[in-house]
Amino acid sequence: MIDRFGRPLEDLRITLTHVCNFECFFCHMEGEEGDNYILSKEDILLVAKVAKNFDINSVKLTGGEPTLRRDLVEIVRGLKQLGYRDVSMTTNGFLLKDLAYKLKLAGLDRINVSLHAISRETFKKITGVDAFDRVIEGIKSAIDVGLVPVKLNFVVNRRNREEVFKFIELSQNLGVNEIHLIELHPVGLGKLAFKEHDDLREIEEYIEKISIKKQIRKKHFRPRYVLPSGLIVEVIKPYANPIFCAGCNRIRLSVDGKLKTCLYREDNVIDILDILKGEYSEDVKEELLGRAFMIAIAIREPNFKYKI
């Protein structure tokens, strides 16, 4: 499906829970400010089933921390049984060592691990948890079982800026495929922490100089730099960036049962909780959810637009 701004809808991003075992001071919480109402596995899979009718073929599972859901493996298996080409997950990696193999068997295709520091001290300052070594073990387990490409997310801020290039070195040594250097943006807890925002321009300019190839990714038109080692460095700058918004191809299912058309906005969401919890047959629910998707696509628009 194409929205009225010519943007294809290809990706469903599902928040499985707001609960997390870390306390990162900048967490954007997927732009959600509602209660931690947890949709059932059946609710999630029903929405995903309807989304397939709109040519959505990719699902990203997020949180909070998705590995805290006891039915995570079953959800992944259900999504693959629906025929999704790509099922991936973003995790803090704390429980990944124990879950990686089970998730791979269930059909998880690839994984993003949030790693915002390269030292135990900085890691604890950012997350509130002394778990750097445990997360590294989780990353190694993901690589070993074949959850590839393994991508590492690094939110750049004033507390970890000096570790960026050592982070690139660590990533190369670990054998990961790709890293994302992400701008801190004022969403969720990031609103309170935006004073820690750090401009990525100088970092990106240096990475471009040492790279052997520059690519532009279709999603969000993100710049990607291939280093001589083969590591891909993707720079993600969503805030006040109309180019980023012009390439957005996703819709979100919030933890409290809303179709959310933009990370930054709460004024153009479609509440589908009553449909999911209503006493309707599954056929009727599918029809009503289909209508909800149509409305969501109709009202979907870039938050940051080009000024003409």
From Swiss-Prot:
The entry's keywords: 4Fe-4S, GTP-binding, Iron, Iron-sulfur, Lyase, Metal-binding, Molybdenum cofactor biosynthesis, Nucleotide-binding, S-adenosyl-L-methionine
Entry GO MF terms: 4 iron, 4 sulfur cluster binding; cyclic pyranopterin monophosphate synthase activity; GTP 3',8'-cyclase activity; GTP binding; metal ion binding; S-adenosyl-L-methionine binding
Source organism (scientific name): Saccharolobus islandicus (strain L.S.2.15 / Lassen #1) (Sulfolobus islandicus)
Needed co-factor(s): [4Fe-4S] cluster
Binding site for [4Fe-4S] cluster 2: C245, C248, C262
Binding site residues for S-adenosyl-L-methionine: G64, S114
Positions annotated to bind [4Fe-4S] cluster 1: C20, C24, C27
Family: Belongs to the radical SAM superfamily. MoaA family.
Catalytic reactions of this protein: GTP + AH2 + S-adenosyl-L-methionine = (8S)-3',8-cyclo-7,8-dihydroguanosine 5'-triphosphate + 5'-deoxyadenosine + L-methionine + A + H(+)
Record EC number: 4.1.99.22
Annotated function: Catalyzes the cyclization of GTP to (8S)-3',8-cyclo-7,8-dihydroguanosine 5'-triphosphate.
PROSITE patterns in the record: RADICAL_SAM
Enzyme's top EC category: lyase
Protein name: Probable GTP 3',8-cyclase
